[in-house]
Amino acid sequence: MKEAKIENIDFGNALSERYLAYALSTIMSRSLPDVRDGLKPVHRRLLYAMLQLRLEPNSGYKKCARVVGDVIGKYHPHGDVAVYDTLVRLAQHFSLRYPLIDGQGNFGSIDGDNAAAMRYTESRMTEICMLLMEDIDKDTVDFRSTYDDSDLEPVIMPASFPNLLANGSEGIAVGMATNIPPHNLHELCDALLYLIDNPQAGINDIMNFIKGPDFPTGGIIIDKAEVINAAYTTGRGSFRVRSRWEKEELSYGTYQIVVTEIPYQIQKSKLIEQIAILLKDKKIPLISSIRDESTDIIRVVIEPRDRSCDPQIVMESLFKLTNLESRIQLNMNVIGSNNVPRVMNILEILQEFLVHRKNIIIRRSTYLLNKIKQRLEILKVLRIVYLNLDEIIEIIREEDEPKTIIMERFKISAIQVEVILNTRLRSLQKLEEHAIIDEHSNLQKQQAILEKILKNHKELWQIVKKEIKAVQTKFGLNTIIGARRTSFEEVDLTNQVVDITAFITKEPITIICSKMGWVRSLKGHNTDLSTIKYKEGDTEKFIIEAYTTDKILIISSKGRFFTLLADNISKGKGTGGVSIKLLVDIGNNDITNILVYKPNQLLLLASSIGKGFLVNSNEVIAQTKTGKQIMNIPEGYSCIACLPVNGDSIACIGESRRLLVFNIDEIPEMKKGQGVVLQRFKNAKLLDIKIFNKQDGLSWNDGTKIQLEKNIVAFLGKRGGFGTFPPIGFPKNNRFSP
């Protein structure tokens, strides 16, 4: 037995080479579409397999299992699930703007329901799909061997329509991704026709025809025109898409809101579930219920809390909190005609498509021209046969080598003789001279046209235009499938601030947060704290008086701010309440302070490293549960204070037991960061700060009573100083309060 050859190689080099091969495989053979036909290899192989099975629009359906079997057996040696999922998506009217497959059976729903098993469903190609493979049998594209060299598959499709932009594409490769939304085919054809007539046109000229994406699920794009144009110019950007809704009047002056279209790629069932959860958690007090009345069309009914609610405000609150408004990404990363992936702008994609179509027509014309020349040679032979039929028959019957005799007698080629010898006698007898002459004349006319196309650049582009116009006529705005579904509406998002608190009854409450992080609210102010019960080993930490309409600021020890609506805090005198971790994503961090939000209020932030800064309260409002990072805290330190600025001076004291007092004007106002040095230390940390008015003196609580120091001259200094020893009687824990 021959011994295996073992080669020693560097592991790092081997790993990098194999990873590079894998990365290139995912980019070129799996995840990114080709700019010319807009297809990935799995799409191309699937559609070509269906063409081979003759699953044309006017033919019968075949089981999807049969189609998938042919694809994975002949062209695509991967799992059947991946191929079937691809087939299903190409048939879903809510996934593709122009479906390429006509499915029969359960192909899933916009609710996220899965399609039936492939043994139950059937499919065939759509008319627009046939345009992708039109003239594929006329040598218009190159073919290559399949994975096992048993068959051939097309490298690219002829693509008579711009499928990449019409249906869009998405995929994630190694180190790159693509996300191209669908567009309206009529508008794309207009842009292509203009580009043929005006080769020097720019993106701004093209954008006069292409308004923006056209999603299969409709919706409303609310971005401004300049934002949309900027995205198409760079090939990267995003679009904000809102659901389409209408107000339905009911009896007694009541109404309900009906959502008829939702953003692209949003599952309706999950959207309704999202709204229902927010409704249960009292995050959207403007509505009372939501229900799904959808059939073949989307109909989601939202009932307002009462008829006094403005439907526009109701919807603005839902747009802000739910996927009724969604952001669709644009990343036009595709494989170019040179097989190099890159991000293209919309003009480059259209130009690549036009060049592709020009090459297809050149190859098709060349192929047809060669076929015509071959047929003309045959017709020439047939006319000779017609005029000399008896002589030819006699030569065939009498001579041992009729081929040579016929070639010499009639001065024709060996190929032409083969045509004569391979023609049946019955066919020879039926020859008619006028039919041969007519066909010869017609073919010569066609030959002249094709030669003119190949020689004349303008004629070639006229054919491209003619075919694009034919596609536009068949799938234009006047057709059911071609009518634009997504509309545009500029919305000034800066003015779309929904004050939900306006719909909450204003009532006084007392918010209590324990040391263990349990928070609750009690009705009224001046609450008898002795009646409040806590969990075993727990006690109060923060007690603040607020109103149900207030926003509550929660500051963590890591400098992150969280915002809660006071009305959403659990109510009741029972032990505990609700853990703060269920309301905000504070993690295992401690709570530094809890404050009632007041607009444009200055807050002083300080960390144990001795730094701090002023921040406007408007800058710390967090819109999500994850909060907003305001103060950057180094590892090993924490945010020790967040205080409203209600004085002209600040007192700082740390582990070094040095007290420093300086004017609060020395501290800068910032939006976020670490801040500036408040008090300097050597191997110590800042423990506490206090804001006060200099004329009132500095006070502190020693645990028994409030102490006051009127003469603070000895402790005055500049920001960033070390400070001096505090007054006699200052607490030994170096804090202004116990």
From Swiss-Prot:
Its EC number is 5.6.2.2. The record marks K40, H76, H78 as: Interaction with DNA. The keyword DNA-binding applies. It is found in: Cell membrane. Residues 32-496 form the Topo IIA-type catalytic domain. Signal peptide: none annotated. GO terms for molecular function: ATP binding; DNA binding; DNA topoisomerase type II (double strand cut, ATP-hydrolyzing) activity. CDD domains: TOP4c (cd00187). It is an enzyme of class 5 (isomerase). It holds the Pfam family DNA_topoisoIV. InterPro entries: GyrA/parC_rep, Gyrase/topoIV_suA_C, Topo_IIA-like_dom_sf, Topo_IIA_A/C_ab, Topo_IIA_A_a_sf, Topo_IIA_dom_A, TopoIV_A_Gneg, Type_II_DNA_Topoisomerases. Keywords: Cell membrane, DNA-binding, Isomerase, Membrane, Topoisomerase. The keyword Membrane applies. Disulfide bonds: none annotated. It comes from the Bacteria. The record marks R119 as: Transition state stabilizer. The active site is at Y120. Heterotetramer composed of ParC and ParE. Topoisomerase IV is essential for chromosome segregation. It relaxes supercoiled DNA. Performs the decatenation events required during the replication of a circular DNA molecule. This is DNA topoisomerase 4 subunit A. It comes from Rickettsia prowazekii (strain Madrid E).
